[in-house]
């Protein structure tokens, strides 16, 4: 089981990668939504804001008003962010949960 710090570090790496991709591509994704990530086996959550292809303001705690919600175990979250776990297959099998409206899901797919 990954630790809370490992999950936080993985999410920060994801935010840095998204920031670099948004800066280098010049192709802004029109998505401005609050995002929350719940780590089921640790009982913790993180939240931030997806804006222009970037994940900003990542902090500890849940955001009950999040329009995009990711749910995963600590190991699955770290593996997904490290590229060791296929997001689409994990979501289809129910290993990782993503709650968002269908249009946001299509935009998220471009970011991942």
Task: Label every PLM stretch briefly.
Residues 1-112:
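Feature captures hydrophobic
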């Amino acid at each position: 089981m990954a630790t809370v710090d490992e999950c936080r570090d993985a999410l920060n790496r994801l935010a840095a990668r998204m920031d670099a991709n948004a800066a280098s591509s010049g192709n802004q994704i029109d998505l401005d939504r609050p995002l929350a990530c719940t780590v089921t086996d640790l009982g913790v959550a993180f939240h931030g804001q997806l804006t222009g292809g970037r994940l900003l303001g990542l902090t500890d705690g849940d955001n009950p008003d999040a329009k995009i919600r990711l749910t995963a175990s600590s190991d699955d979250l770290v593996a997904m962010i490290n590229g060791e776990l296929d997001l689409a297959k994990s979501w289809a099998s129910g290993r990782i949960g993503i709650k968002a409206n269908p249009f946001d899901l299509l935009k998220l797919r471009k970011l991942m």
